[in-house]
């Protein structure tokens, strides 16, 4: 059911007959007037004709069934909706799943998101990725697509090797019971990395010129300060690692040996230790994300790609390409594309893509080469029509390199259907984050802080603490999703839990208000008893908004813009709360007016229930 579409179709038919212009062309150019007194649906005439005679036409039919008046204002033809007929269209058979229309030709879509390095807890940067990825998957499912969510486990790189070295130097201890496991892993990684960097900087000082010396001393001071803070918190781990690392003459060689032994599966102990550490960290990730109701269908290990020889096959294929070249002493794939290919791959014409280095001088492959193999795997394993990678905007060029490489290696269809869903950074005021230095605000810390603020506000209002985690989830989700993905998010914990405006809890509160009005009603809703003359002011605005919901929701899903859906729901909540503060519903003595208002409440309740569910926010019956 799409009521506003029915309105537009009728209006387009009327105008098509009067102007002798194709009905579909008229329909596609409809707009909504900026001011409600102008009308409800508008056609800018110059978008459909350049004919001066038609541009100056002034007489139109009086209307139809859903359009009760047609009026011209300058170059615009405006239609005014017949409120009573629209009301009947919506509520005569009002479905419980009112909202997103199911797509006629569903696709199989893979959404890969979060994919954080398994070396420390998830932090605020991962938070935006995880929520966006989860909501994209939910939106696509709501539209009728078959969706598979995947997490790419980066277990074969230098960072995991540093973590592994630290863990081995500590004597392979068991995790403490009183600390979250990924937090403990992050401590080992950060301390090991800081100590390695300090030792390296000290060695470099003797061969540095004056300017380099000043810069390195400054960096060394910062590292030593951080090391001191870590030692205060974790003296046993720090002292043990400091002692063991000081005994190693060539620590880089140790790290490289771990990397090579793991990539080649040539040392069973290294393989077992890394898998153990990585899986421990993933358990911590899952525990954190479970609070936000985020789950994955599959976890894909980078090492499995290497061990299965998929990456070797890609290198072999690339080496036979006519685009292969030498680049700075390495083997690389030249990414020269014609303008048509760039357009198809969404790569700007003026951007020069650097060659894709396939193999390092030491024979190991880069992550971009592995990404080619992984992209093919994602399409293959799920028989996917489309793969969406949720990755920060800083990775835009590597993602373009990936698409270009696939295209030039003969996988043109896959390259064109590999989508980079880019997003901006999350800013926490006064905080510079660095996972390798152990300087970050973890997702768990954010959840706990939001939980504390929400708990205090619920207690102030005498609310239900049983819903606390659902309110925490909604506050965090809304704060992330209400901002367009390509813009940065400034995360202020105190502002995101506001029961009175512009927040997830505010929408939940509005839903609870609408639900409880209906729950207290003892009358059966009967459209034959409605007083249509009372569809005025905010009630009319709500009716028009209810009519528009399927169009707005479907467009938001198809364009992957959850912020549009949330913005629409917030607008409805604002109108509804303003109206409810001035007009009673259940206490209205006039049966016709009371029945009308109950139907309006029912419409708002359904929109909020279905809209919130789509974005992973639980509609609450009590707050």
From Swiss-Prot:
EC number(s) given by UniProt: 6.1.1.19
Protein name: Arginine--tRNA ligase
Record SUPFAM superfamilies: Anticodon-binding domain of a subclass of class I aminoacyl-tRNA synthetases (SSF47323), Arginyl-tRNA synthetase (ArgRS), N-terminal 'additional' domain (SSF55190), Nucleotidylyl transferase (SSF52374)
Gene name, Swiss-Prot/TrEMBL: argS
HAMAP family in UniProt: Arg_tRNA_synth (MF_00123)
Family, per entry: Belongs to the class-I aminoacyl-tRNA synthetase family.
Gene3D superfamilies tied to this protein: Arginyl tRNA synthetase N-terminal domain, HUPs, Isoleucyl-tRNA Synthetase, Domain 1
InterPro entries membership: Arg-tRNA-ligase, Arg-tRNA-synth_N_sf, ArgRS_core, DALR_anticod-bd, Rossmann-like_a/b/a_fold, tRNAsynth_Ia_anticodon-bd
Record CDD domains: ArgRS_core (cd00671)
Gene Ontology MF: a single term: arginine-tRNA ligase activity
NCBIfam families, alphabetized: argS, PRK01611.3-3
Gene Ontology annotations of biological process type: arginyl-tRNA aminoacylation
Residue numbers covered by motif 'HIGH' region: 116-126
UniProt entry keywords in alphabetical sequence: Aminoacyl-tRNA synthetase, ATP-binding, Cytoplasm, Ligase, Nucleotide-binding, Protein biosynthesis
Chief place where the protein resides: cytoplasm
GO CC aspect terms: cytoplasm
Reaction catalysis annotation: tRNA(Arg) + L-arginine + ATP = L-arginyl-tRNA(Arg) + AMP + diphosphate
Enzyme class: ligase
Subcellular location as annotated: Cytoplasm
């Amino acid at each position: 059911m799409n009521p506003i579409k029915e309105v537009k179709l009728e209006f387009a038919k009327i105008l098509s007959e009067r102007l002798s212009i194709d009905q579909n062309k008229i329909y596609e150019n409809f707009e909504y007037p900026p001011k409600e007194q102008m009308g409800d649906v508008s056609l800018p005439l110059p978008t459909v004709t350049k004919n001066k005679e038609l541009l100056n036409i002034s007489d139109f039919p009086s209307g139809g069934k859903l359009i009760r008046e047609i009026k011209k204002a300058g170059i615009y033809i405006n239609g005014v909706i017949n409120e009573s007929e629209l009301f009947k269209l919506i509520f005569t058979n009002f479905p419980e799943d009112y909202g997103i229309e199911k797509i006629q030709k569903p696709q199989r879509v893979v959404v890969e998101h979060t994919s954080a390095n398994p070396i420390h807890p998830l932090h605020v940067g991962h938070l935006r990725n995880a929520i966006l990825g989860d909501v994209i998957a939910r939106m696509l499912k709501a539209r009728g697509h078959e969706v598979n969510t995947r997490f790419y486990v980066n277990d074969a790189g230098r960072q995991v090797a540093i973590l592994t070295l630290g863990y081995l130097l500590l004597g392979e201890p068991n995790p403490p019971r009183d600390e979250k496991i990924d937090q403990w892993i992050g401590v080992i990684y950060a301390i090991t990395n800081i100590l390695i960097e300090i030792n390296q900087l000290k060695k470099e000082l003797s061969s540095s010129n004056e300017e380099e010396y000043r810069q390195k001393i400054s960096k060394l001071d910062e590292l030593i300060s951080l090391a001191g803070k870590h030692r205060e918190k974790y003296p046993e781990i720090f002292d043990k690692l400091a002692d063991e690392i000081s005994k190693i003459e060539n620590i880089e060689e140790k790290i490289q040996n771990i990397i090579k032994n793991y990539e080649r599966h040539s040392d069973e102990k290294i393989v077992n230790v890394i898998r153990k550490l990585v899986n421990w960290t993933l358990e911590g990730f899952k525990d954190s994300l479970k609070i936000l109701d985020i789950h994955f269908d599959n976890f894909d290990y980078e090492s499995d790609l290497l061990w299965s020889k998929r990456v070797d096959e890609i290198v072999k294929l690339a080496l036979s390409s006519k685009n292969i070249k030498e680049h700075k002493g390495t083997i690389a794939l030249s990414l020269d594309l014609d303008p048509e290919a760039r357009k198809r791959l969404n790569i700007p014409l003026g951007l020069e893509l650097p060659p894709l280095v396939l193999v390092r001088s030491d024979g190991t492959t880069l992550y971009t080469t592995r990404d080619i193999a992984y992209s093919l795997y994602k399409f293959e394993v799920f028989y996917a029509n489309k793969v969406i990678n949720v990755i920060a905007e800083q990775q835009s060029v590597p993602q373009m390199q990936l698409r270009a490489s696939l295209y030039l290696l003969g996988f043109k269809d896959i390259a064109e259907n590999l989508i980079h869903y880019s997003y901006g950074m999350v800013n926490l005021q006064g905080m510079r984050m660095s996972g390798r230095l152990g300087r970050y605000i973890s997702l768990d810390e954010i959840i706990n802080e939001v939980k504390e603020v929400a708990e205090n506000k619920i207690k102030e209002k005498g609310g239900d603490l049983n819903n606390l985690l659902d309110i925490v989830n909604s506050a965090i989700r809304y704060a992330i999703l209400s901002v367009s993905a390509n813009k940065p998010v400034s995360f202020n914990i105190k502002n995101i839990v506001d029961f009175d405006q512009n927040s997830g809890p505010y929408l939940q509160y509005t839903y609870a208000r609408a639900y409880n009005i209906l729950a207290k009603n003892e009358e059966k809703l009967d459209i034959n008893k409605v007083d249509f003359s009372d569809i005025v002011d905010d009630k009319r605005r709500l009716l028009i908004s209810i009519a528009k919901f399927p169009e707005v929701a479907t467009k938001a899903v198809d364009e992957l813009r959850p912020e549009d859906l949330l913005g629409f729901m917030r607008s409805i909540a604002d109108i509804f709360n303003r109206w409810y503060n001035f007009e009673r519903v259940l206490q209205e003595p006039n049966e016709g007016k009371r029945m009308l208002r109950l139907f309006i409440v029912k419409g708002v309740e359904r929109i909020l229930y279905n809209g919130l569910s789509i974005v992973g926010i639980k509609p609450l019956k009590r707050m």
